[in-house]
Amino acid sequence: YRVRKKDCIDLPEKMYVQRSIEFPEEQRKAYEQLKQSALIVLKNDEVSYNNKLTELLKLQQVANGFLKTNDGKIVDFKTNAKLKELMSILEESEDKCIIWANYVHNIEMIKKKLGEVYGKDSVVSIYGKDSVDVRNKAVENFQHNDGCRFLVGNPTVGGYGLTLTAAK
């Protein structure tokens, strides 16, 4: 049995707002260096697709405020422009918010910052390392606890099969 969203839920249209963010100097330099090496790797037909994908993922990580080194260590940039902009956006609203992030490190970074600013009970997260029970409790808390304003998660874990009506 399949039910389409348009047949059962009256949802407002999606709104997309694009914001341009200027990288701080340290982040910009790292991005440019990685971009130059990525271009060399991407143009090389002898390099595997996995290596090419790794280069692109590193660029994405830098754009998100951190870099996972080849030895697995995660290095955060001193200033995270995207996180700063997110906090600015969230200051504009008192409503509940769902924040999707692609990397576990981003989810943890966002959750930590929101906890510092709004209180640790104001935010829950859902991502792959969490058991189904832990995820369900987080969603339940977000849906029914007025003090819990933010759900930070990975769209592959929480993008389907969840009812998140608490956020506008």
Language model features with spans:
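Inter-lobe coupling linker of SF2 helicases/translocases
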Residues: 1-95
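Phosphate- and divalent-cation-binding pockets in alpha/beta enzyme and binding domains
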Residues: 30, 106-113, 163
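Short, glycine/serine-rich, charged loops/turns that create anion-binding
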Residues: 66, 104, 130
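Short, well-ordered alpha-helical scaffold segments within catalytic/effector domains
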Residues: 79-87, 104, 135-139
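Conserved helicase ATPase core of P-loop NTP-dependent helicases/translocases
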Residues: 98-100, 108-158
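A short beta-strand element within the Helicase C-terminal
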Residues: 162-168
